Amino acid sequence: MTEDQAPILDFWGPLRKTTQSRIGLGRAGDSLPTKRVLEFKAAHAAARDAVHEPLDSETLASRVDGVGIGAPVVVASSVSTRSEYLRRPDLGRQPADLSAIKSSDKEIGFILADGLSPRALMDHGEQLLSALVTALGERYSIAPPVIATNARVALGDHIAAAMGVQTAIVLIGERPGLSVADSVGIYLTHLPRVGRTDADRNCISNVHPPEGLGYEQAARVVLGLVTGARQLGRSGVDLKDTSRADAVASGEVLTLD
């Protein structure tokens, strides 16, 4: 085999298997290879579809009911259409009608919100909720869950106040990107009330196994944050997640072959 016939090694191939990020795209003249251009267009289309796809609240409610913490109530924000939801974030933070929610004296309240990716909630909502209930259920009382459509994170404050819970945990579809269109974010607010800001919350993002954070891993982080928030008396910027340091100390770290 001559030097000109030597095989071309794909340096990026092994690295590409470890991430969904768009790395090592290559070149074809002054542009990208056709394969990479088509991959980009497909990812963009998937992100657009995830944003505009409506939540199948009936199917999700049936799945959530099977978790065993009570039949979920379905509520909506003040948004009338999906396009209005994208144009008016403020309306997504305001409830339309919360009269169906019954107040309780429970400690934890789960709100499953479609957010910017209803697909994420359909793909991961039930399994993530089940993992959270398993992690928290032995220590804390849990109210029947609420499903919210056309919802922003702050809508959870209104819902949690109506639920009468001490800690609100919002599971919401995150804004799709060009590598992930089905990621769930978890927002924890201790002593929720209308008017809370993002500084009063803790967020665990990128929940979408197998590529992203796993359900059980996320549940362990949430358990630590809930315990810390109750000890501290508040959530937000003063409450730190130490689970990563604990994982390193215990030897539970990611290694690449």
Swiss-Prot record:
Protein keywords: Bacterial microcompartment, Cobalamin, Cobalt, Lyase
GO MF term list: cobalamin binding; ethanolamine ammonia-lyase activity
Pfam families noted in UniProt: EutC
Any single biological process term in GO: ethanolamine catabolic process
Positions bound to adenosylcob(III)alamin: V153, E174, C203
Cellular location(s): Bacterial microcompartment
Cofactor or coenzyme needed: adenosylcob(III)alamin
EC number: 4.3.1.7
GO cellular component term, pick one: ethanolamine degradation polyhedral organelle
UniProt remark on cofactor binding: Binds between the large and small subunits.
Reactions catalysed, as given in the entry: ethanolamine = acetaldehyde + NH4(+)
Pathway where it operates: Amine and polyamine degradation; ethanolamine degradation
Superkingdom as given in the UniProt entry: Bacteria
Record keyword Transcription regulation present: no
Complex and partners: The basic unit is a heterodimer which dimerizes to form tetramers. The heterotetramers trimerize; 6 large subunits form a core ring with 6 small subunits projecting outwards.
Main function: Catalyzes the deamination of various vicinal amino-alcohols to oxo compounds. Allows this organism to utilize ethanolamine as the sole source of nitrogen and carbon in the presence of external vitamin B12.
Cross-referenced HAMAP family: EutC
The family this protein is said to belong to: Belongs to the EutC family.
The name this protein goes by in its record: Ethanolamine ammonia-lyase small subunit
Gene that specifies this protein: eutC
